[in-house]
Amino acid sequence: MNNVIDFWPTLKRLLYYGTNVKKYLILGFTLLLFSSIFEVLNPILISCFIKHYFINNTVNYSLKIITYYLILQILAAILNYHQNIIFNKISLTVIQKLRYDVMSSTLQLPIKMFDQRPIGQFISRITNDTETIKELYDTVIKSLFQNIILILITLITMFILEWRMACIASIIFPIALIIMLLYQYFSKPILRKIKVYIANIYNIFNEIINGIDVIQQFHQEQKFRKSIKKISISHYYFRMKILKLDSFLLRPLLNFCSTLILCGLILIFGIYPIGFFEIGTLYAFITYLNRLNEPLITITSQQSIFQQAIVAGERIFEIIHTPKQQYGDDSLHFREGNIKVKNLYFSYTNNNVYVLKNINIFIPSKQFIAFVGRTGSGKSTLSKLLIGHYPATLGKICLDERNIQTFTHNVLKKNISIVQQDPIILNDTILENITLGRNISTKKVLKILKTIKLIQFVNSLPKGLKTLLGENGNILSIGQKQLLSIARTLISCPKILILDEATSNVDLDTENNIKKILSSVKHLTTIIAITHRLSTIKHADNIFVFNNGEIVESGTHYNLIRKKSYYKNMYYSQAIKN
């Protein structure tokens, strides 16, 4: 029974989006009302035509009735055309607002959401689910209102014409209600599973497109074909279940019930003496029963679309209602850029399995600091905490003697920048990839390109800064992408600069270039380099060595090399390999 009841909160939220287009809704429903009235009047006119032409033989009056009938048909067609335009406009406006809201909420979600969920799930909800809700507005709501009006007017007319026959015809309503409730109960869990499989299909295609080089290199095509086939078969299975449910509970069952009621009407007509019911009245009732049957069939058959929209709404509102990334309200910018981490513990889950344990460090401003350690030792995790993506489980992080959790998003964004191992390059110009829409002069951009030694390459391009870089910067080498990523961070003059494995994928020349860049900006910003390449951080002011989520030692390169240390073993082991 819960499946029948729990759609109301979601439906109310979906209908609330229509309040922004109240005027259009009122106009659309008004046009629907009049077009429905005109449609209901047509059988009465035909009934009168039969009476006056075939029985009373009054030709002139019959011609008038035909004229009225044609006028009503034309008016109904005009009104239907305009209300279709209006409801399509309403649905597009509502979906535009809904997509904006879900996209806006997605942009503010905690980073852990993207770490824990496949990207395909988000794409499915933003595209496929919102398109499903569009059908709720341009098909279901319009049709529901129109058919309810048709049913009410038809019923009133039937009771005015002949109440006995009307009572028999009304039996169809409780039957239709039972069918709708049964359909709703059985269809909702199936539709939820269909949505999950659609999201999985989006996700696997996203993986294939983004990782096509690796898939082909390691001959994994067959594995992904099997994955697609498995998900597609599951999707097909549940689609067929819903189609079978539609085929049994919707149109066929209602048609059968309607036929039984029609037999009942004919039986009543036959039981009463000849002349008790006019032949025109019987014709009108047969017509009205069909008119009743069609709206009820439409309403029940649209239960599938309605249920899909409710399930899609639940998935969308789950994103919208997810607590956003939490920031404080301290809008005072950094003065220096020093960092203090005290008694810090961190776990990605709530099971007390800490990936960082008892971290205590102090980093003075404008120093070059390095975090080193083997893969999985906790270096990059600490960087995520330093930029505010995750809160500490225990302990605290202070920037400029203030708790990081008190800062606004804007302050953190302007004062802390990070260069990732795999730079994200937009399908835009070089200029836009550096400025990212910020109000930065071309002169300043050229200056930073000169600093990172990309100016010669940019000047060699026919369009210079206006050159389009293509999908993920496909006209650039890996080293050039990384230098461009460094340029976009340095141009905003951050107080703290974090380089997370920024040199791991570049050649030796680019690595040396990056070292020179860091040396030139060292007096302007606090630099934290997270790296496996120990040769790049030999001149760091302090090196923190991580192992199993703990800092096991710290000091300069030369101090750590002089004594028997974990760092020394790492350094010489790497030197021998090189």
From Swiss-Prot:
Ranges that cross the membrane: 26-46, 59-79, 143-163, 166-186, 196-216, 260-280
Domain ABC transporter: 339-573
EC number: 7.6.2.2
Enzyme class of the recorded protein, top EC level: translocase
Binding, ATP: G373, R374, T375, G376, S377, G378, K379, S380
One Pfam family matching this protein: ABC_tran
Bilayer topology annotation: Multi-pass membrane protein
Gene3D superfamilies linked to this entry: ABC transporter type 1, transmembrane domain (1.20.1560.10), P-loop containing nucleotide triphosphate hydrolases (3.40.50.300)
GO cellular component, one term: plasma membrane
Record keywords, A-Z: ATP-binding, Cell membrane, Membrane, Nucleotide-binding, Translocase, Transmembrane, Transmembrane helix, Transport
Occurrences of domain ABC transmembrane type-1 (ranges): 25-308
Catalytic activity: ATP + H2O + xenobioticSide 1 = ADP + phosphate + xenobioticSide 2
Localization of this protein: Cell membrane
First-listed, main subcellular location of the protein, grouped into a coarse class: membrane
SUPFAM superfamilies, per database record: ABC transporter transmembrane region, P-loop containing nucleoside triphosphate hydrolases
GO molecular function, one term: ATP binding
Annotated PANTHER family: ATP-BINDING CASSETTE SUB-FAMILY B MEMBER 10, MITOCHONDRIAL, ATP-DEPENDENT PERMEASE MDL1, MITOCHONDRIAL
Family indicated by similarity: Belongs to the ABC transporter superfamily. Drug exporter-2 (TC 3.A.1.117) family.
Descriptive protein name: Multidrug resistance-like ATP-binding protein MdlB
Native species: Buchnera aphidicola subsp. Baizongia pistaciae (strain Bp)
Gene: mdlB
